A protein has these predicted regions:
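N-terminal accessory segments
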Residues: 1-121
Length: 121
């Protein structure tokens, strides 16, 4: 039972990861995944917010923080099988607000979800 008496119980880690890696490259992600595999740790991914479903946290896990993966690239005339036209390549740490700003600069439309307090899925 939760109380306001600090001597009434133990302080625990709770449902949070015990390790975290703030990645800024693909090689950092590869190293983190290998560490989690070798240490038999649950792996969770955290981008720019949190998930109400708990996907961005987990007791005893290794959390990979992708917030610094900010690559954002615009392709005005992408040509691939089945599609021809403008496109964007968006890194895992780019916020929807940043995507919208880039789309506005490039005079294109971008569709995404946004929630001012957390990642909304």
């Amino acid at each position: 039972m939760v109380t306001d008496d600090p001597s009434s119980g133990n302080c625990t880690q709770g449902g949070f990861p015990i390790y975290a890696v703030n990645v800024s490259s693909v090689s950092h992600i590869q190293l983190a995944i290998n560490f989690a595999r070798n240490a038999n740790l649950r792996l969770v991914i955290k981008n720019t917010g949190h998930c109400y479903l708990g996907k961005s946290s987990g007791a005893g896990a290794l959390s990979i923080w992708t917030h610094n993966l900010k690559n954002l690239e615009y392709f005005p005339g992408l040509e691939i099988p089945g599609y021809s036209g403008p496109a964007m390549k968006v890194g895992a740490g780019v916020t929807v607000r940043e995507v919208y700003a880039e789309a506005d600069r490039d005079d294109i439309s971008a569709l995404g979800g946004i929630c001012e307090v957390s990642d909304c899925h």
